[in-house]
Structures are given as structure tokens and as C-alpha cells.
């Protein structure tokens, strides 16, 4: 068996980020061949990934990346098994690298991201293989759960990540004055994170959801002994309150409860003499 030096072990650890004892074992198993040792560790990571495939990976973080010109952005959720790992530099650095890669390649799905290659500084593997390697390194199941890419050629993208990175939101505003509208976009991203709307306006709320809510309100009213002739009016009133909870434009603005988001947008349009419209948003909360 070849003599394994401390320097060889350190070099392998620096290259892979895997613990010293595992690196020593890999070098011993491969006769001190650095390339074979790296491959050995990758295979070990893949085996561990397969072993932990059924484990529950409900911890992790929300990662958002927005381009310097605010014309594109991406939000993703990367999961692991424990909060301890989720807060570590290795995991957060890996999530950030995935976010950078997804933004750079304008990646629109997790499947597409898994087929891309990591930067050389992150090992140069395909993302799918890098996740298996990361599983071996951290000893936990690592799972790329979801991803959404924004293209805002007609305006700007802005985002907000709550401290702890368990909640994040990203929003696309169409506007002809993106620089002036940027502070409002930031506020609205925070609004989406805090108030959890499901759609931009009430016309986008799915009809099946409206029907479900209406039936619940109807049965509640009848159960409270309300007369049949008044029930429809009661249902409409409660639907209005429902819209104020789940529709972004009808919510109270996070920085002024006296104004709806729609009124804030109208005010900005007049003040800036600019077109400003919310096109879409995505809100991710860890584990949803």
C-alpha cells in the first residue's frame, strides 16, 4: 500500500471539502491516486444519497438571485434534513452557487438546472452529481425542491428574503421608469412575503377556489340561521373580505394600512408620470 502523507489528505480535503478521515480512507483505498480518490468519494456520496433518498428533507433555505440590471431573477428552494446543516457555510454556499448558475443560464426548471455543470470552483460536476457529492459531504439528503425564473425585459425584478432564509418573495413589475420604481418594487416584494397573497388581482383567482369559498360562506350563513333571501348578499360581502386577504392589489399596503396596494400604485403612476403594473410574483416558504 502506498504511503499516504498528511499533505495528500489535506489536498484532497481542500479539493472536496470532505472530512479528513474520509479523505484518508479514500486515498488508502485507491493507492494514493488523487483522481481515483475523488471518484471514490463521489461514488460514496452517490451511495449515501441513494441510502438517504427516503429521508425527510424539510429543512433548508430559500435562495434568490437578481441580475445587476434587475431584468431577470430566480428563486429556488434547497432542502436538507436538519437546521444545523441548513445554517452552515457549506450548504448556504452551495445554495448560492445554484442560484448564480440558474440566473446565469436563465434556467426555468429544476430538471434543467440538474443538467447544468457547476463552476470549477464548486467541483465542475453536473448539478445532479454535485447534489450527491454534497450529500456525501454533509451526511444528509440534499434536495433541489423547486425553482422559478423571472424575465422582466419590460420592467424590473425585485426580491426580499426574510432573515433566516426560510421565507422569500420575488416580484416582476412592468414599468417605463424602473430606477424610480425600484423602491416600490422592494416594498411590494416584502408585502408578498409578509401578507402571502395568492394572485395579483381578483380576476386571476381560480373559479374553483371562489366556488369553494362561496359554498363555505353559504353554509356558515345558513348554519347561523340567516334567511335564504339574505344569504347571497352575505356571501358576496365575505368574498370581498376574502379578496382583501389573498389578492395583492386589494391588500392593505404593508407601509400604510390606510391605503390598498392598488391605491399606492395609482399614486406612483401620477407622481412619476410612469406606467407601473404588477405582472407576477412568487412566494416560497420553506417546507410548503
Curated annotation (Swiss-Prot):
SUPFAM superfamilies to which the protein is assigned, alphabetical: Elongation factor Ts (EF-Ts), dimerisation domain, UBA-like
GO molecular function, one term: translation elongation factor activity
CDD domains hit by this protein: UBA_EF-Ts (cd14275)
InterPro entries xref list: EF-Ts_dimer_sf, Transl_elong_EFTs/EF1B, Transl_elong_EFTs/EF1B_dimer, Transl_elong_Ts_CS, UBA-like_sf
Keywords: Cytoplasm, Elongation factor, Protein biosynthesis
Gene Ontology CC annotations of this record: cytoplasm
Region (Involved in Mg(2+) ion dislocation from EF-Tu): 82-85
Subcellular location: Cytoplasm
Similarity-based family: Belongs to the EF-Ts family.
Function, in words: Associates with the EF-Tu.GDP complex and induces the exchange of GDP to GTP. It remains bound to the aminoacyl-tRNA.EF-Tu.GTP complex up to the GTP hydrolysis stage on the ribosome.
Protein name: Elongation factor Ts
Amino acid at each position: 500500500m502506498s504511503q499516504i502523507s498528511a499533505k495528500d489528505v489535506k489536498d484532497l480535503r481542500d479539493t472536496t471539502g470532505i472530512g479528513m478521515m474520509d479523505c484518508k480512507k479514500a486515498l488508502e483505498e485507491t493507492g494514493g491516486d488523487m483522481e481515483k480518490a475523488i471518484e471514490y468519494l463521489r461514488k460514496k456520496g452517490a451511495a449515501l444519497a441513494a441510502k438517504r433518498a427516503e429521508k425527510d428533507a424539510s429543512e433548508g433555505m430559500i435562495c434568490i438571485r437578481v441580475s445587476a440590471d434587475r431584468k431577470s431573477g430566480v428563486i429556488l428552494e434547497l432542502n436538507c434534513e436538519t437546521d444545523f446543516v441548513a445554517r452552515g457555510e457549506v450548504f448556504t454556499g452551495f445554495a448560492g452557487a445554484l442560484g448564480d448558475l440558474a440566473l446565469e443560464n436563465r434556467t426555468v426548471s429544476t430538471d434543467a438546472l440538474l443538467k447544468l455543470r457547476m463552476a470549477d470552483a464548486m467541483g465542475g460536476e453536473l448539478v445532479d452529481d454535485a447534489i450527491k457529492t454534497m450529500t456525501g459531504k454533509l451526511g444528509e439528503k440534499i434536495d433541489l425542491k423547486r425553482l422559478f425564473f423571472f424575465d422582466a425585459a419590460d420592467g424590473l425584478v425585485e426580491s426580499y428574503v426574510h432573515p433566516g432564509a426560510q421565507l422569500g418573495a420575488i416580484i416582476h413589475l412592468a414599468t417605463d421608469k424602473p430606477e424610480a420604481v425600484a423602491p416600490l418594487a422592494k416594498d411590494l416584494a416584502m408585502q408578498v412575503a409578509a401578507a402571502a397573497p395568492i394572485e395579483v388581482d381578483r380576476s386571476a383567482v381560480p373559479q374553483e377556489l371562489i366556488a369553494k369559498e362561496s359554498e363555505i360562506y353559504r353554509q356558515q350563513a345558513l348554519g347561523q340561521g340567516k334567511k335564504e333571501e339574505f344569504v347571497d348578499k352575505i356571501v358576496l360581502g365575505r368574498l370581498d373580505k376574502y379578496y382583501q386577504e389573498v389578492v395583492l392589489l386589494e391588500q392593505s399596503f404593508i407601509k400604510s394600512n390606510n391605503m390598498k396596494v392598488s391605491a399606492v400604485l395609482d399614486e406612483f403612476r401620477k407622481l412619476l408620470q410612469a406606467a407601473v403594473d404588477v405582472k407576477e410574483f412568487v412566494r416560497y416558504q420553506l417546507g410548503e
